[in-house]
């Protein structure tokens, strides 16, 4: 199991490399990381909360269309066969939703990386792939056949509320962890 000290050391090694954004994803796979996911994301979080580091944070990884430079890609291993509908409250996770421990670990990792790299935990610097896709025109309400909706909605482990905006959940938990 990867420790917080390992995450902090990883972030320390990435200082002064121009990293100023973090993008959060789901892999569209099972709860275990595979070789394709390892190639695309800096960090993967498996269904049981196991954290897998895939190189250095300064390594170039292709995770978010036109947003890979100066960015870290972190993915939750989940959402195998999942589908979303134009009514976003109608997500079919196909038995592989993000687990509460994955969401907690994601927020924890963001908290420590953002602190070390001095990345503000706000909607400009830490976002889900769904949020980036909406900005860039290939989100849920665009017409792109390669639409992305990664972590559009999440259950909030802090409040117990279901189907909350994913970016808000992640940032809120990360900020809470940063302040406590």
Give the location of each predicted region:
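N-terminal catalytic cores of peptidoglycan-degrading enzymes
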Residues: 1-68
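Structural preference for beta-strand elements that scaffold enzyme active sites
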Residues: 21, 71-73, 125-127
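Short coil-to-beta-strand
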Residues: 66-85
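Basic/polar, cationic surfaces and motifs that engage anionic cell-wall
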Residues: 1-16, 85-180
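Acidic glycine-/aspartate-rich tracts in secreted/extracellular proteins
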Residues: 29, 79-81, 131-134
